[in-house]
Design a protein with these regions (language model features):
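C-terminal motif of bacterial Sec signal peptides marking the signal peptidase cleavage site
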Residues: 15-18
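N-terminal leader/targeting pre-sequences
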Residues: 20-79, 84-187
Length: 187
C-alpha cells in the first residue's frame, strides 16, 4: 500500500509542479517600450517682405526635450527676434498668414522663462554678424513634436524671424518689426 501511495503522491507532485512551471513561464512575458524614440523635423525658411534672407532649422525631440538648431543667412547685421507663430502658413508676401505668436496658454508676451509669463512662441533675440549670418540654439521641455498636448505641440506652427529685436514688453508682439523669414513646421 505504501508503494501505491508513494507513486500517487509522486505523480500528483510532478503534475502540479509542471502547472506551476507553466504558470511562471506565462507571467515572464513583458512588453518593451522604446522610451528613447527620437523625433525630428527640418524646416526651410523663405524670405518675406522682399528681404532676401533665408534660413534652415532642425527640431529634434529626445527623452522629452526638444532641441532647436537654426541657421540664418542674408540678414541685416544686428539683433533680430525669432518666434513661433500660430499657423504653418507662409503664403502671404508679408508672412502675416502665419497669424500671431503661438500662445496656447494665454499668457502675456514676454521673455522666454519670465516668471510673469510669456508665449510658448516667444523664443527671443539673436545676433546677426556683419556677413548677415546668425544662429539660434535652445532646448526646452515646454515643446513636443506631434504629441497630443496642444499646449506643447509645435507641429502646425510657423517660425518667423523679424527685422528688429523683441523688446519683451510691448503687447502682444514685442514690437519686433516686419516678418522677414517664414517657415512652416510640418511633417
Amino acid at each position: 500500500m505504501k508503494p501505491i501511495i508513494l507513486t500517487l503522491f509522486t505523480i500528483f507532485f510532478l503534475s502540479t509542479s509542471s502547472c506551476i512551471e507553466n504558470e511562471k513561464k506565462e507571467t515572464k512575458k513583458t512588453t518593451q517600450v522604446n522610451l528613447s524614440e527620437n523625433k525630428e523635423i527640418r524646416v526651410q525658411l523663405e524670405p518675406k517682405n522682399n528681404s532676401g534672407a533665408i534660413g534652415k532649422l532642425r527640431f529634434n525631440e529626445s527623452k522629452g526635450i526638444v532641441k532647436l538648431e537654426a541657421k540664418f543667412m542674408n540678414l541685416s547685421p544686428g539683433i533680430h527676434a525669432i518666434h513661433l507663430h500660430e499657423k504653418a502658413d507662409c503664403s502671404l508676401p508679408d508672412g502675416k498668414s502665419a497669424g500671431g505668436h503661438w500662445n496656447p496658454t494665454f499668457n502675456k508676451h514676454g521673455k522666454w522663462g519670465d516668471e510673469n509669463g510669456y508665449h510658448k512662441g516667444d523664443i527671443g533675440n539673436f545676433e546677426v554678424d556683419e556677413n548677415g549670418n546668425g544662429r539660434v540654439t535652445m532646448e526646452t521641455k515646454e515643446w513636443c513634436i506631434n504629441c497630443e498636448d496642444q499646449t506643447k505641440n509645435i507641429v502646425g506652427k510657423a517660425v518667423i524671424v523679424h527685422q528688429e529685436a523683441d523688446d519683451f514688453f510691448s503687447q502682444p508682439s514685442g514690437a519686433a518689426g516686419s516678418r522677414i523669414i517664414c517657415g512652416g513646421i510640418v511633417q
